[in-house]
Every structure is written in structure tokens, then in C-alpha cells.
Regions:
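Gram-negative (and chloroplast) outer-membrane scaffold detector with strong preference
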Residues: 67-170
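Short loop/turn motifs that connect adjacent beta-strands in outer-membrane beta-barrel proteins
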Residues: 25, 36-45, 78-90, 147-153, ...
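Outer-membrane beta-barrel translocator domains and adjoining extracellular loop/strand segments
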Residues: 60-64, 104-111, 167-177, 218-225
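Residue-level signature of outer-membrane beta-barrel architecture
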Residues: 54, 75-77, 144-146, 196-198, ...
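Outer-membrane beta-barrel "beta-signal"
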Residues: 71, 227-241
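Cleavable N-terminal export/targeting peptides
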Residues: 1-40
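Transmembrane beta-barrel strands of outer-membrane/channel proteins
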Residues: 46, 50-56, 90-100, 156-162, ...
Length: 241
């Protein structure tokens, strides 16, 4: 799976860095004292920009990998509150990913345990697999922007989203069309993440994040094996207004 994931993510990341370089070169260098994360967040600004994301499943989904690309929009809502190292500001944000892919093992036979009439056993059953494409939206991102330094603005966040895929996901036992069974084309994505903005120009920053994402249909399908955990990394470019 990594053979498919790594080249795609490298190409997408290279494209993003090229765009950010063009954006920076289009402006004259600004004095260093104009680049201040704390000054920007003090204005309770809007923030928006593109990002790339990729990662892998863990545990029994370690042979799954993911890539996605999209845009984020957020608004810092409050001034700073709370004491000490947890001092920060509340931000509400959302993300839209028109490109979302998951690479899974190819269709195969898999030993599956079953229970019938009080008896248990196992059998080799056909499983679906391959590449799944879709669209994802994360309309609820609750972010706590921790107190920034001059150039770095860290955060922690909790979020919830939704994925639609072109086939039922994750791959599971193949069932005949029209028959009950299988998973769902709709899945939910509760998640937790950490990250930071690194300010490179006045009101512009590179953005880095790491997210632990759970994928589950909440039993919208007849089966809900889900992806209990995946670790996905994000890189983006952000403008602040």
C-alpha cells in the first residue's frame, strides 16, 4: 500500500510547496518584526488555505493507506483564556476534501469465523478490495489555539466528519447485488489532532498537523468493521484575514 501512497503524496506535497513559493516570491520581503503569530491571533482573524493529507491505518488495518487534498476555513472566536500552558483561544473551523482515496489489499479470499445454529467454524470467503475514491467533509472542528510565540501557533483539536466513497467501505465480504450484507458508502470520521502554524510572512503560515482518525458507518450498512484507527499527517498553507 505504501508503494501507492508515497508517490501520490510526494507529488501533491511538491505541488503545494511550489504554490507557496510562488505566493511568497510575488511579494517583497517584509521586515522580520512584521511576522508575528501572537499579533495575528489577537485580532481573532479568519484563516483559510489548501492542504494535503496522507497516512496509514494501524492495528488490523495496517495494510490500508490514505491520501486526500482539500481546503480549510476557520474563525478564531475568542480572546485568550485560562492560565499557564493551557492558555489559548477557541477557534471553529471546517474542511472540504473533494479528493479522498484509500488504498486497500486487492480482492482476495480470507478466512472468516462464523456462528450458525450454536456451532462455530471458519471458511474462506471472497473479500472486496483495491482503491476506493470519494469525497470527505469535516464540518465540525473545535480547535484550541494555544498561546503563540512570535512565529509558531500550536493547537489541539477534536473534530467530526463524513466520507462518501464510490464503493462500500471498508472492503468486506462480497455479497450479490441486491442482497443484504456488506458495509456502506457513507462513513463518519470522529478524530483528534495536534498541529501548529509556522508564520513565514505577515498573515501567512505553513501549517502542519497530525490526526488520529476513526472511520465508522455507525451501522448504516449491514456490517460495520470500520477502521478503528488511522494516523494521518497534514501539510498546508494558510492565509489570515
Amino acid at each position: 500500500m505504501l508503494k501507492k501512497f508515497v508517490p501520490s503524496f510526494i507529488v501533491l506535497a511538491s505541488s503545494l510547496f511550489s504554490l507557496s513559493a510562488i505566493a511568497q516570491n510575488a511579494q517583497e520581503p517584509a521586515p522580520d518584526n512584521d511576522i508575528s503569530a501572537s499579533a495575528v491571533l489577537a485580532t481573532r482573524p479568519w484563516e483559510f488555505g489548501p492542504f494535503l493529507q496522507g497516512g496509514v491505518g494501524v492495528g488490523d488495518r495496517s495494510d490500508f493507506s490514505f491520501t486526500s487534498a482539500g481546503a480549510r476555513l476557520g474563525k478564531v472566536i475568542t480572546n485568550q483564556h485560562l492560565p499557564g500552558f493551557i492558555r489559548g483561544q477557541f477557534e471553529y473551523a471546517g474542511e472540504l476534501m473533494p479528493y479522498w482515496q484509500s488504498f486497500t489489499p486487492a480482492p482476495h479470499l480470507q478466512e472468516t469465523k462464523y456462528e450458525f445454529d450454536g456451532q462455530t467454524g471458519s471458511a474462506l470467503l471472497p473479500y472486496n478490495g483495491g482503491t476506493f475514491s470519494g469525497v470527505s467533509i469535516t464540518p465540525i472542528i473545535l480547535r484550541w489555539d494555544l498561546k503563540p510565540t512570535k512565529k509558531i501557533a500550536p493547537w489541539v483539536q477534536g473534530a467530526g466528519g463524513l466520507i462518501w466513497t464510490n464503493h462500500k467501505y471498508p472492503p468486506d465480504i462480497i455479497v450479490e447485488h441486491g442482497q443484504p450484507g456488506g458495509t456502506s458508502v457513507w462513513n463518519f470520521t470522529p478524530q483528534f489532532g495536534v498541529g501548529f502554524h509556522y508564520f513565514v510572512r505577515p498573515r501567512q503560515s505553513l501549517t502542519f498537523a497530525a490526526n488520529a482518525i476513526h472511520i465508522s458507518s455507525a451501522s448504516l450498512g449491514d456490517r460495520n468493521p470500520g477502521v478503528n484507527a488511522s494516523v494521518q499527517f497534514q501539510i498546508g498553507y494558510t492565509w489570515w484575514k
